């Protein structure tokens, strides 16, 4: 049976190019979350365990046998919660993917979604970014189940491609996770607008955990990310947003009744005219 409500901790990080430092930050944030709250799902941002700070830098690929997943599995069991790692550089059949990972309250570690749309862009006046130099493209959407809630997955740049979210809408997901590491320039212009649009058009909750702040790496690299981790309801209302720079979290309670209310008022699923294609 599906739970009527789902309590989520939407976590913001300032990850760097050092796994141990990032893992310590995740542990500290979990400790802070569970001091006063009992979320059933904790969501972390894209690149939570390793963030490349210098373009062209070699990214380490992790396998599920790595000790860091064992540690995160222990934490998931300890706190009796689902941990959603927004993305990690994961080796799958010898190839590197920017992949989400779900860790269940029983400690099971599951690679789930591989980022489909890779960030190969050239902003005016800035250096080119080519994510595809490091990663392979994922091939398909994915839907998780958390206590009966159907959860679609996307990662960062995916948010610009409405067709992915249209697929999730047609499958009537309850929630879409969009972990990210947005640039400041694109974040200021597009972050809020895109995420609210995706929630409204899919008539589902959208929870976007972000990297935010100034990242100073152990190898001398630096980077700025936009932050503004945000939770949005199916009507497009902002339930919570982290407006300060740096690590933090926001707790939100998602209601199945709210999803049903929105879909009853505006029954989009009966009005669709174009096929998926």
Segment roles from a protein language model:
Residues 5-17, 43, 99, 149-158, ...:
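Active-site-proximal beta-strand elements of phosphoester/diester hydrolases
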Residues 19, 24-106, 110-112, 182-202:
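Cys-nucleophile CN-hydrolase/nitrilase-fold catalytic domain and related Cys-dependent amidase chemistry
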Residues 57, 101, 112-119, 230, ...:
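Short beta->alpha transition motifs characteristic of CBS
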Residues 65-84, 159-249:
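CN hydrolase (nitrilase-like) catalytic-core segments centered on the catalytic cysteine
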Residues 85, 99-102, 142-144, 229-231, ...:
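Short beta-strand scaffold segments in enzyme catalytic cores
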Residues 91-171, 184-193, 197, 255, ...:
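Active-site catalytic loop in hydrolytic enzyme cores
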Residues 257-277:
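A conserved C-terminal secondary-structure "cap"
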């Amino acid at each position: 049976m599906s739970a009527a409500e789902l309590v989520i901790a939407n976590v913001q990080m300032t990850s760097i190019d050092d796994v141990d430092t990032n893992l310590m930050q995740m542990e500290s944030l979990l400790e802070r979350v569970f001091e006063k709250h009992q979320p059933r799902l904790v969501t972390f941002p894209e690149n939570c365990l390793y963030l490349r700070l210098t373009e062209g830098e070699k990214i380490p690929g992790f396998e599920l046998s790595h000790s860091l997943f064992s540690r995160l599995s222990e934490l998931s069991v300890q706190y009796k919660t689902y941990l959603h790692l927004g993305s990690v550089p994961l080796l799958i059949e010898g190839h590197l993917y920017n992949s989400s990972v779900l860790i269940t309250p029983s400690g099971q570690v599951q690679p789930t979604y591989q980022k489909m749309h890779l960030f190969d862009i050239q902003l005016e006046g800035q250096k080119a970014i080519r994510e595809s130099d490091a990663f392979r493209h994922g091939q398909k959407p994915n839907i998780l189940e958390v206590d009966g809630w159907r959860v679609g997955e996307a990662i960062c740049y995916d948010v610009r491609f409405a067709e992915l979210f249209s697929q999730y809408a047609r499958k009537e997901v309850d929630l879409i996770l969009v972990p990210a590491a947005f640039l400041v320039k694109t974040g200021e212009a597009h972050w809020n607008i895109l995420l609210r649009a995706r929630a409204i058009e899919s008539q589902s909750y959208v929870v976007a955990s972000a990297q935010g702040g100034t990242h100073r790496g152990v190898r001398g690299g630096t980077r700025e990310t936009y932050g503004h981790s945000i939770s949005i309801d199916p009507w497009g209302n902002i339930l919570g947003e982290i407006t300060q720079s740096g690590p933090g979290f926001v707790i939100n309670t998602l209601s199945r009744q709210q999803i049903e209310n929105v879909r009853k008022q505006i029954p989009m699923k009966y009005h669709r005219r174009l096929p998926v294609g």
